[in-house]
């Protein structure tokens, strides 16, 4: 197992100084790829093991199985030359000869090479060696149904026609042997039930993967062969080549594989095409999967490198651009998967001298080119398996690559493991039903997985903001200093100490993504999802949800000898695709316990119980003429869809789902008995992946838009049966648990949604409600087909039911103590909510559900509204922050209009695309649109702008009314009345009206109108000294509050001896600091005026 090297307490390498010294010594004649000795020594501590001797031969032989962990896969088309194919020299000649033997039949007389697809598996050996496995002799194929009257002559003619069709494309003309094989195989289409079962199909194997789509299109147009027709529907022509390989050979994503001893050829060091430790060649049949058990369910010590860059705008205006503006620092944090996160090793590459940083390797340079070249050397020699960071795909990586182009640094483009393939950046977009559509970048860094934490968080969590600061506070309860790019230039040009400050900030931005990966178990969960679904790890990051079900479906079809149509021709159906049932809610605030009955894995269970599948769907009555009515399930609806029952034929989808559910049960048992924490995390990731996978199959069949194999007949049938089961449960509960059957109360189903029903049994005792819930679940489950099962899981008490899919309650699984407050559809967090609304929603729910005090909730709401209208609310609670997107300038939104205003005021500090824009809504003229009244919070403070409290009152009213309207008769009274009649309105010097009005002078003691400040006659005569002392006291209190906030910010930035320059507007302390600073200035002015009056 690879050992983690510990970082020295502090280490500074003055690369720039040493390099300049060397240039002087050698009269500027320094070799192009020269690496300073001190830097070389540092890298050697972290390089992978060496397996070659001095002349480049491997120090081990192929007489043992080679077992490696698969990280990534791709394929390339490579030219294999004639002298290689017939080469008989060398100690491993027989092995290489066996590997290349199949290529001989592809060689033409007039060419000395053949182009073939080679699958590249990037993997990791247990000792830390990275291994490139070049897999030979596997070729792509697809299927078409063979007409009954097709004979050998027709097959020969068909091959000729396919060659002619491919030759129409000039890129294929150079290949003499394009159709490698046509075989007749017995198999069956997945679509629809057929009584005759297996038929003859043609399995057509071709030379290159890109030929498959061309031939698919050709066959879909019907091919005429000797007056006979073939085609129309093509089978398995859409499956990516890599998936085709791993499915055929039962290899799953992120698994251990075995290259059998005596069958692989170890390449000489000089023949390597990659930066991996070593490379092998092997024929596909000698690579086999290893079962996920014992030591082979563990994840090896993957090398994960998290990095972050800092750059400056040379002219000081706007956001840096790679074409002109330099990278001044790159933090690089090396972490070995499975180790404690605090053991990571920190490197910081800086432009110009930087002071030492405890626990970090500081390498500083005199020029940017040398810095970037050294970082490239670092990447190649450290050889990370994963590249991570925060938004590295959309910012850091493109900036580095584009900066390399601007500086003509050709070497910087080679960040991947394949030596001669440059990394390039392409604009791309990602679309799926679950995640929507968003623009991104596509960067080819072969062999290294780009594991961007920003994308992972956005994909898996719904948050108010996705800045690193907000996300870190949400999950790690940590804040970080946010140094705005507009002040980076000053810090960079000041001193080694100021550059240290940038470096400390940059290092933290590299460490936090690793801590998030560790905290949220991203590696474990994604590895297990790849294993469960059989999908390559990288596909989970770059493709939608459907690829996971596609992989499972193809695997099961391969096992049971079915073929899958590439284009599904759906039947005509007028059946409207309805979703799940939602029983009309009986809205209210229920003090008595509400029992919840849940169907366990409802949709997967329906599939299994009723045998719903592509392969069991009846298309033609002719196919079931020999069957009895009891052999068929009819789904009542407009079309009366029909499926054969499992006694006739077991469906593929039910088999897949059944295996996933059973596997999850076994894994959960293993978790109970497992003592090792790492193994527990692996197993927990697996059970989660199994659960998600089982629940994804239904959605796969219902994906009519952009789906890979939609079948609305199956999806409609599932939801129809689900609706009938919810309705049947309601009817059975209410008819059995009633007074006429001897129960104390009549039960009522107050709500039902998708796979659960909420029942009010009438009792006030939580334990009794649980007993009745368990009894109801067992009793009603008997009326459904196995494995459909109704389970009692929880009781809510109290329970607040607002509407369909909107409820909250205290959740009990134990009658003695509630587990948590459970909210569904009640938005306490929305991106357009200010913190005040979020706080009020949470507090009101807490008072209603935990304190069970309606009056307290009402009084709290009124008091907060009064505080708002009298300007006693912390301004930071009113701030809304949004990100400025590329296309936002086309729309009139508050943050967009403000960005335009800020640009007019000062283009140097104005926000750019990608920046966060914070705003408050201020008062305006009558009829002025809201987006025109968005203003910068600091500008509001500086100019005493009047905040539009009515806007915030309306914003509060909408979500709170939804809660209170089901509890009290007149919920509007919360937002009108005595508590709303007193308003404090600030007077601004910035309005048009202020030019014509003279601001009245007020007494700082009693606020009465006076002619001469600071005090009125009454206060001057009776209270002057006490007012003065009170102002002094207020001044000191505000100072203390400011110092406390200042110290908290200094702790966050990791240094108690430097000024706070953080510009993190997602942090509430930022605005509190600004507001208190303003208050201190006002109090200072008042105290001074009182002194002068003496």
From Swiss-Prot:
Example GO molecular function: 4 iron, 4 sulfur cluster binding
ZnF CysA-type: positions: 1003-1019
Reactions catalysed: DNA(n) + a 2'-deoxyribonucleoside 5'-triphosphate = DNA(n+1) + diphosphate
Cofactor: binding details: Binds 1 [4Fe-4S] cluster.
ATP-binding recorded as keyword: no
Keywords, sorted A to Z: 4Fe-4S, DNA replication, DNA-binding, DNA-directed DNA polymerase, Exonuclease, Hydrolase, Iron, Iron-sulfur, Magnesium, Metal-binding, Nuclease, Nucleotidyltransferase, Nucleus, Transferase, Zinc, Zinc-finger
Subunit structure, as described in the record: Heterodimer composed of a catalytic subunit POLD and a small regulatory subunit.
Designated name of the protein: DNA polymerase delta catalytic subunit
Gene source species: Plasmodium falciparum (isolate K1 / Thailand)
Organism taxonomic ancestry: Eukaryota, Sar, Alveolata, Apicomplexa, Aconoidasida
């Amino acid at each position: 197992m690879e050992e983690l090297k510990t970082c020295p307490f502090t280490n500074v390498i003055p690369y720039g100084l040493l390099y300049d010294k060397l240039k002087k010594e050698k009269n500027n004649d320094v070799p192009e790829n020269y690496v300073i000795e001190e830097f070389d020594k540092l890298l050697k501590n972290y390089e992978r093991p060496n397996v070659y001797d001095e002349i480049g031969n491997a120090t081990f032989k192929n007489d043992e199985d080679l077992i490696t962990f698969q990280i990534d896969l791709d394929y390339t088309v490579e030219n294999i030359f004639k002298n290689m194919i017939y080469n008989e020299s060398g100690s491993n000649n027989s092995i290489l000869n066996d590997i290349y033997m199949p290529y001989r039949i592809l060689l033409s007389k007039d060419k000395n090479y053949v182009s073939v697809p080679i699958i590249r598996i990037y993997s990791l050996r247990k000792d830390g060696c990275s291994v490139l496995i070049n897999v030979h002799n596997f070729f792509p194929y697809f299927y078409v149904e063979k007409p009954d009257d097709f004979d050998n002559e027709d097959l020969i003619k068909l091959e000729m026609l396919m060659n002619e069709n491919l030759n129409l494309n000039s890129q294929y003309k150079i290949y003499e042997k394009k159709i490698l094989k046509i075989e007749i195989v017995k198999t069956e289409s997945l679509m629809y039930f057929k009584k005759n079962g297996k038929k003859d199909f043609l399995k057509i194997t071709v030379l290159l993967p890109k030929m498959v789509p061309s031939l698919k299109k050709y066959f879909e147009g019907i091919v005429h062969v000797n007056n006979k027709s073939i085609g129309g529907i093509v089978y398995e022509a859409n499956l990516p080549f890599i998936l085709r390989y791993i499915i055929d050979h039962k290899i799953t994503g992120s698994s251990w594989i075995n290259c059998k001893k005596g069958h692989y050829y170890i390449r000489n060091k000089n023949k390597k095409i990659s930066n991996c430790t070593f490379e092998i060649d092997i024929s596909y049949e000698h690579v086999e999967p290893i079962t996920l058990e014992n030591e082979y369910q563990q994840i090896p010590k993957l090398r994960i490198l998290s990095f972050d860059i800092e750059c400056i705008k040379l002219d000081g205006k706007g956001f840096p651009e790679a074409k002109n503006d330099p990278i001044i620092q790159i933090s690089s944090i090396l972490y070995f998967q499975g180790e404690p996160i605090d053991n990571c090793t920190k490197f910081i590459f800086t432009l110009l001298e930087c002071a030492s940083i405890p626990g970090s390797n500081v390498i500083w340079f005199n020029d940017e080119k040398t810095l970037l070249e050294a970082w490239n050397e670092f990447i190649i020699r450290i050889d990370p398996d994963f590249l991570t960071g925060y938004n590295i795909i959309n910012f850091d990586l493109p900036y580095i690559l584009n900066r390399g182009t601007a500086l003509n640094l050709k070497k910087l483009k080679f960040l991947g493991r394949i030596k001669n393939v440059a990394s390039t950046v392409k604009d791309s977009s990602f679309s799926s039903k679950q995640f929507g559509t968003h623009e991104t970048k596509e960067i080819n860094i072969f062999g290294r997985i780009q594991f961007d934490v920003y994308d992972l968080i956005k994909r898996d969590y719904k948050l108010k903001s996705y800045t690193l600061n907000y996300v870190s506070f949400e999950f790690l309860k940590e804040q970080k200093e946010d140094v705005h790019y507009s002040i980076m230039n000053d810090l960079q040009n000041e001193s080694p100490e100021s550059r240290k400050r940038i470096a400390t900030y940059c290092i933290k931005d590299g460490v936090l993504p690793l801590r998030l990966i560790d905290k949220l178990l991203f590696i474990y969960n994604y590895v297990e999802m790849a294993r469960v679904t059989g999908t390559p790890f990288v596909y989970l990051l770059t493709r939608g949800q459907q690829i996971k079900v596609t992989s499972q479906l193809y695997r099961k079809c391969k096992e049971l000898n079915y073929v899958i149509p590439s284009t599904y021709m759906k039947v005509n159906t007028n059946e409207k695709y309805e979703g799940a049932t939602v029983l009309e809610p009986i809205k209210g605030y229920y003090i008595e316990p509400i029992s919840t009955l849940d169907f366990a894995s409802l949709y997967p269970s329906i599939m299994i119980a009723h045998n719903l599948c592509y392969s069991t769907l009846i298309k033609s009555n002719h196919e079931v003429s020999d069957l009895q009515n009891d052999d068929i399930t009819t789904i009542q609806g407009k079309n009366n869809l029909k499926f054969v029952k499992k006694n006739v034929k077991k469906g593929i989808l039910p088999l897949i789902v059944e295996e996933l559910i059973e596997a999850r049960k076994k894994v959960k048992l293993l978790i109970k008995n497992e003592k090792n924490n790492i193994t527990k995390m692996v197993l927990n990731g697996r059970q989660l992946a199994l659960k998600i996978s089982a629940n994804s199959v239904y959605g796969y069949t219902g994906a009519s838009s952009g789906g890979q194999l939609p079948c609305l007949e199956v999806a409609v049938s599932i939801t129809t049966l689900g609706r009938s089961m919810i309705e049947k449960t309601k009817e059975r509960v209410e008819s059995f648990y009633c007074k006429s059957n001897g129960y104390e109360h009549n039960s009522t189903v107050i709500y039902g949604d998708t796979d659960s029903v909420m029942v009010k049994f009438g009792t006030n005792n939580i334990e009794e409600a649980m007993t009745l819930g368990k009894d109801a679940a067992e009793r009603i489950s008997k009326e459904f087909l196995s494995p459909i099962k109704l389970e009692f899981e929880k009781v809510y008490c109290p329970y607040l039911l607002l509407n369909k899919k909107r409820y909250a309650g205290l959740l009990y699984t134990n009658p003695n103590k509630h587990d948590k407050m459970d909210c569904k559809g009640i938005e306490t967090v929305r991106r357009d909510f200010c913190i005040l609304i979020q706080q009020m929603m949470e507090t009101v729910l807490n008072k209603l559900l935990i304190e069970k005090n309606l009056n307290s909730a009402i009084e709290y709401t009124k008091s907060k509204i009064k505080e708002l209208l009298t300007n006693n609310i912390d301004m930071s609670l009113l701030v809304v922050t949004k990100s400025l997107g590329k296309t936002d300038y086309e729309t009139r939104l508050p943050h967009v209009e403000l960005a335009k205003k800020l640009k007019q005021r000062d283009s140097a500090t104005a926000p750019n695309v990608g920046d966060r824009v914070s705003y408050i809504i201020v008062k305006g003229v009558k009829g002025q649109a809201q987006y025109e009244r968005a203003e910068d919070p600091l500008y509001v403070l500086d100019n005493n702008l009047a905040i539009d409290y009515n806007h915030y009152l309306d914003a509060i009213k909408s979500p709170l009314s939804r809660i209170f309207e089901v509890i009290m008769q007149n919920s509007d009274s919360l937002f009108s009345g005595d508590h709303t009649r007193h308003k404090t309105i600030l007077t601004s010097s910035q309005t048009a009206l202020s030019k014509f009005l003279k601001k009245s002078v007020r007494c700082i003691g009693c606020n009465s109108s006076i002619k001469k400040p600071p005090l009125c006659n009454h206060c001057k005569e009776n209270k002057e000294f006490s007012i003065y002392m009170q102002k002094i006291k207020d001044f000191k209190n505000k100072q203390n509050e400011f110092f406390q906030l200042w110290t908290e910010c200094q702790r966050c930035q990791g240094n108690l001896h430097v000024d706070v320059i953080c510009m993190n507007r997602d942090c509430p302390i930022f605005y509190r600091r600004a507001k208190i600073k303003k208050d201190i200035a006002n109090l200072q002015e008042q105290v001074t005026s009182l002194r002068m009056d003496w």
